[in-house]
């Protein structure tokens, strides 16, 4: 029996919490039962549907915004161009320069807006969770970044020269290479994708758990506990609202960091023999 079939779904938002009990955050929220397609490699669960929905929404936004572009942008076109210019100027060109920034702009832009859209689901009512809180999407995005920066380095230098330039620190005594080469190898080819993946997942997972905890506690204090305990619902809902705004900051910060580090790793691969 598949894991999704063994775990019952608990939606921990205040809109679905049972009226007579309090549920603390659990793993059930991250492994909901399948919907629509119930078996095989194309099984769909709630998080997968959210992932598809947010991808469609962000694509639709840019299609509609740029459908009839004007010389002087306004409305949705203005918002879309500002967002695209932010990625182009502050990430791609800032790290890679204009020529290489233009070359890798599609990849960096795609990563940035996929992360933003997926993260945004964590504060949208009735969705209440980011697909990035589960390992699948961060793993795919980290793998994409990993493939791109290694491909770039191998294409420019060849496999062996690229690997050698990435892990051999020039100008150090020979005995130190026995210490530094393994460290550089692990840092470049293992820790880079691993930290990209874990940083994104851990931040969105922590944010989801905090919001669930505060709003579930608010529901419990106001509608379940009764009596004097209801007063504790006030600080819990204030904390929940405050952390919602903080989560909004984290949503964009994580997208920026992921896209920025992808650009940095591409830059390091392009100049592997200079580091």
Swiss-Prot record:
Subcellular location: Cell membrane
Keywords, alphabetical: ATP synthesis, Cell membrane, CF(0), Hydrogen ion transport, Ion transport, Membrane, Transmembrane, Transmembrane helix, Transport
Protein name from the UniProt record: ATP synthase subunit a
The species this protein was found in: Rhodococcus erythropolis (strain PR4 / NBRC 100887)
Regions crossing the membrane: 46-66, 104-124, 135-155, 166-186, 204-224, 231-251, 252-272
Membrane topology: Multi-pass membrane protein
One Gene Ontology cellular component: proton-transporting ATP synthase complex
Function: Key component of the proton channel; it plays a direct role in the translocation of protons across the membrane.
Subunit composition and interactions: F-type ATPases have 2 components, CF(1) - the catalytic core - and CF(0) - the membrane proton channel. CF(1) has five subunits: alpha(3), beta(3), gamma(1), delta(1), epsilon(1). CF(0) has three main subunits: a(1), b(2) and c(9-12). The alpha and beta chains form an alternating ring which encloses part of the gamma chain. CF(1) is attached to CF(0) by a central stalk formed by the gamma and epsilon chains, while a peripheral stalk is formed by the delta and b chains.
CDD domains: ATP-synt_Fo_a_6 (cd00310)
Family according to the record: Belongs to the ATPase A chain family.
Molecular function GO labels: proton-transporting ATP synthase activity, rotational mechanism
Gene that encodes it: atpB
Entry annotated with the keyword Transmembrane: yes
């Amino acid at each position: 029996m598949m894991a999704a079939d063994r775990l019952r779904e608990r939606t921990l938002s205040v809109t679905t919490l049972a009226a007579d009990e309090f549920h603390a955050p659990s793993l059930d929220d991250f492994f909901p039962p399948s919907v629509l397609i119930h078996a095989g490699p194309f099984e769909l669960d709630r998080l997968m549907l959210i992932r598809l929905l947010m991808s469609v929404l962000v694509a639709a936004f840019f299609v509609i915004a740029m459908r009839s572009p004007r010389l002087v942008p306004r409305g949705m076109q203005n918002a879309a161009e500002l967002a695209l210019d932010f990625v182009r100027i502050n990430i791609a060109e800032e790290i890679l320069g204009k020529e290489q920034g233009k070359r890798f702009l599609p990849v960096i832009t795609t990563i940035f807006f996929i992360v933003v859209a997926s993260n945004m689901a964590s504060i949208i009512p009735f969705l209440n969770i980011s697909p990035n809180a589960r390992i699948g999407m961060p793993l795919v995005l980290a793998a994409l970044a990993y493939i791109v920066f290694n491909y770039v380095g191998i294409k420019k230098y060849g496999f062996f020269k690229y690997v050698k330039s990435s892990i051999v620190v020039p100008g150090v005594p020979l005995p130190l290479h026995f210490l530094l080469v393994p460290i550089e190898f692990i840092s470049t080819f293992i820790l880079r994708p691993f930290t990209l993946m874990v940083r994104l997942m851990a931040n969105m997972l922590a944010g989801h758990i905090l919001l669930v905890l505060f709003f579930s506690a608010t529901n419990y204090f106001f509608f379940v506990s009764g009596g004097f305990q209801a007063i504790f619902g006030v600080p819990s809902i204030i904390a929940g609202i405050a952390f919602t705004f903080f989560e909004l900051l984290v949503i964009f910060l994580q997208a920026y960091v992921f896209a920025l580090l992808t650009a940095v790793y591409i830059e390091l691969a392009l100049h592997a023999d200079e580091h």
